[in-house]
């Protein structure tokens, strides 16, 4: 397609030319139909390089923009920024979600400082709308420079396998989708741009229209799986059949976060012990971000706890992971949405307080009868409290384990935790689903007033 457009006929033809950018919008909207906005807006002798539109996704209104890499490599011009800003403005006025489809090599350098102002305005819009209407970013091609910051300002970022997401190119990392998944910048990696748009739709349908709307309700099927011991198995056995969408699977691999439905209503699911008994800094950051996103849209958070605590080796301490641990605690404590916890295995010390403790996290906390809840790991507690009994033992390891088992049964069982008021009830595996559904229903009217302040000063 020629970059130069001189007549109205050429303008109309150019605006309707089939492109990947236009096709991606047909993937997004119901029946591939949408109403285009500012179709003839131009930057000099060419179109603005972005298609902006509104339509319906699963029957609900959505605004979207899709960058067109065939026009000046999708470079952001002042004209393109104005089109995108209009989408954000309309979304703010109407309380409607925004989907941004990114495919651009960055700003148009010929615009000079105008491009900087344009990006600044768009970043202001995404910031102002954060937590007000859902924002989903789809990285379908190259997303470079300030555009990468714009995409990462969304609630969730989905990326195609062959796409790139970077602020500055790095030959060593290669700016790949795989890297974006591993460092947590992309929540989902898909085979191609069409699959990425479909994944964005799947996430979007689980979110409310805005922060004042209720979570969507759907007809649902009961789960077909028995409750297992792994994070994914528990989520799929408790939530509605085929409703679980895991997010950030490659980042913070000891933890599990997912959107799902429970009794037809959206819930956020957090689980530990996906691959490791202890949570890393990445796990803490991942869970904190997810909990804050759910809280922004009043999505109930269900946390399945089975962890020995936080990883605290020399490398972790040197990294300053305590900041991420504090961030996790802060995210749960600050959240006013419904918070439910089920201790399915081990829950020791700070991890119990952060994830399942009634003082800061859970409105209601339950435990399986096999749960072990303790301020210290039983082995550590025995070393500290019963050290004299270990003296002279022929087999020190066996003696320590015997005392630890006894300590767990007598001092750290679910029954002891219930007597001490640490959990609200002891349930069996086959009771988890119904208990959670009943709890969400009875807590639907939850209201909490916070102390007046500009914002909390969470560790970032």
Where are these regions (language model features)?
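Ligand-binding clefts of soluble mixed alpha/beta catalytic domains
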Residues: 1-460
């Amino acid at each position: 397609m020629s970059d130069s457009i001189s007549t109205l006929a050429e303008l109309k033809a150019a605006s309707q030319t089939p492109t990947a950018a236009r096709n991606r919008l047909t993937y997004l909207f119901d029946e591939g139909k949408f109403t285009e906005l500012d179709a003839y807006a131009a930057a000099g002798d060419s179109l603005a390089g972005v298609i902006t539109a509104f339509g319906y996704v699963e029957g609900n209104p959505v605004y979207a923009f899709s960058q067109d890499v065939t026009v000046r490599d999708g470079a952001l011009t002042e004209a393109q920024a104005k089109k995108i800003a209009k989408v954000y403005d309309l979304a703010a006025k109407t309380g409607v979600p925004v989907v941004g489809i990114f495919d651009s090599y960055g700003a148009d350098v010929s615009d000079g400082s105008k491009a900087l102002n344009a990006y600044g305005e768009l970043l202001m819009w995404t910031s102002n709308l954060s937590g007000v209407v859902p924002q989903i970013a789809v990285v379908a091609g190259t997303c470079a420079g300030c555009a990468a910051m714009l995409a990462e300002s969304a609630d969730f970022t989905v990326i195609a396998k062959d796409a790139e997401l970077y602020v500055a190119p790095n030959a060593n990392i290669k700016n790949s989708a795989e890297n974006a998944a591993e460092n947590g910048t992309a929540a989902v990696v898909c085979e191609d741009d069409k699959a990425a748009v479909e994944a964005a739709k799947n996430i979007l349908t689980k979110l409310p229209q805005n922060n004042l709307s209720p979570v969507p309700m759907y007809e649902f099927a009961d789960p077909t799986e028995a409750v297992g011991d792994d994070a994914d198995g528990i989520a799929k056995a408790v939530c509605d059949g085929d409703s679980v969408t895991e997010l950030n699977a490659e980042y913070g691999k000891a933890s599990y976060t997912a959107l799902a439905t429970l009794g037809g209503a959206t819930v956020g699911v957090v689980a530990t012990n996906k691959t490791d008994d202890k949570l890393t800094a990445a796990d803490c950051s991942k869970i904190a971000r997810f909990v804050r996103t759910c809280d922004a849209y009043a999505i109930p958070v269900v946390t399945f706890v089975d962890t020995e605590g936080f990883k605290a080796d020399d490398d972790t301490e040197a990294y300053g992971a305590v900041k991420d641990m504090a961030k996790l605690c802060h995210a749960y404590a600050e959240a006013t949405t419904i918070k439910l916890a089920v201790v399915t295995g081990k829950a020791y010390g700070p991890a119990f307080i952060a994830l399942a403790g009634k003082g800061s996290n859970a409105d209601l906390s339950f435990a399986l009868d096999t749960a072990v809840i303790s301020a210290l790991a039983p082995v550590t507690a025995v070393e500290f409290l019963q050290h004299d009994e270990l003296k002279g033992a022929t087999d020190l390891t066996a003696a320590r384990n015997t005392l630890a088992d006894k300590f767990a049964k007598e001092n750290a069982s679910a029954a002891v935790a219930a007597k001490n008021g640490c959990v609200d009830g002891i349930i069996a595996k086959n009771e988890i689903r119904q208990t959670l559904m009943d709890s969400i229903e009875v807590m639907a009217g939850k209201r909490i007033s916070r102390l007046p302040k500009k914002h909390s000063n969470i560790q970032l």
